[in-house]
């Protein structure tokens, strides 16, 4: 089994750095509750239960899978139920055990993401979905940080494929747009996230390179605001079409 990235090290701050704005999250959840009513749902990478907890509280049957015990412990404290610790590419479920499956911000962390899609297709009867942000924001601060550490000699790339790139491989069967939304962020909050190395791409950056990258970012962005507009897309594929994505991308 290829190595897996566990988010235990950032479990305590994960929700505050990865969650959607409350208004946007409420709209997405409302759409999902309507769509998933009466379905048995598998969430791979359930983590702290950002999606699973409110869906479960709304009466949706969600089974979660994860490898990070600390992330799941936080979810359990929030009311998360029905979690299995397992590898996403080797799911411990019978074929066609679920109506619907989902991943969100998971596949880019998994080098054998094609095997994960194959497993999702195996255990799912109907559809797979993910929530994608379509935005005019280009993550300026994070991109500047990445450019600075790369210029200093450190290069890192995600081992897998971002869910947001799946539609480029195969046209979705159905998209539910949610939004648009307009938000204002304080750059200081993002600077703090970067300084704490909350993103997996930062975890192995040498200390000196990290420190030197943060200095010009603080000087440029401290005290400023970042505004952006975005729409969320709840994007669905029929289970059998995941096989097309997985097999067409085999090296």
Model features per residue range: what roles?
Residues 1-37, 50, 54, 71-74, 127-158, ...:
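Conserved class I S-adenosyl-L-methionine
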Residues 42-44, 48-90:
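Class I SAM-dependent methyltransferase SAM/SAH-binding core
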Residues 102:
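A conserved beta-strand element that flanks and buttresses the S-adenosyl-L-methionine
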Residues 105-109:
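Short catalytic micro-motifs in class I SAM-dependent methyltransferases
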Residues 114-128:
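A short glycine-rich, Lys/Arg-flanked "PGG" loop and its adjoining helix->strand segment in the class I
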Residues 156-172:
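Short alpha-helix
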Residues 174-251:
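Conserved Class I S-adenosyl-L-methionine
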């Amino acid at each position: 089994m290829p190595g897996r990235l566990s988010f235990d090290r950032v479990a305590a701050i994960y929700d505050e750095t990865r969650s959607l704005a409350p208004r946007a999250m409420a709209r997405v959840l409302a759409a999902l509750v309507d769509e998933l009513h009466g379905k048995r749902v598998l969430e791979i990478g359930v983590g702290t239960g950002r999606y699973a907890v409110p869906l479960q509280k709304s009466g949706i049957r969600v089974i979660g899978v994860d490898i990070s015990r600390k992330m799941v412990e936080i979810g359990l404290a929030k009311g998360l139920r029905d979690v299995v610790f397992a590898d996403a590419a080797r799911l411990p479920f019978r074929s066609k055990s679920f109506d619907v499956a989902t991943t969100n911000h998971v596949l880019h962390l998994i080098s054998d993401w094609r095997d994960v899609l194959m497993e999702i297709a195996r255990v799912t009867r109907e559809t797979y979905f993910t929530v994608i942000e379509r935005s005019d924001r280009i993550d300026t601060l994070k991109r500047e940080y990445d450019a600075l550490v790369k210029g200093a000699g450190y290069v890192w790339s995600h081992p897998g494929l971002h869910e947001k790139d799946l539609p480029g491989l195969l046209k979705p069967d159905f998209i539910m747009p949610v939004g648009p939304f307009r938000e204002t962020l304080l750059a200081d909050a993002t600077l703090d996230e970067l300084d704490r190395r909350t993103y997996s791409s930062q975890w192995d950056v040498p200390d000196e390179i990290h420190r030197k990258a943060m200095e010009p970012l603080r000087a440029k962005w401290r005290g400023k605001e970042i505004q952006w507009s975005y729409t969320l897309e709840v994007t669905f594929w029929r289970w059998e079409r995941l096989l097309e994505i997985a097999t067409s991308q085999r090296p």
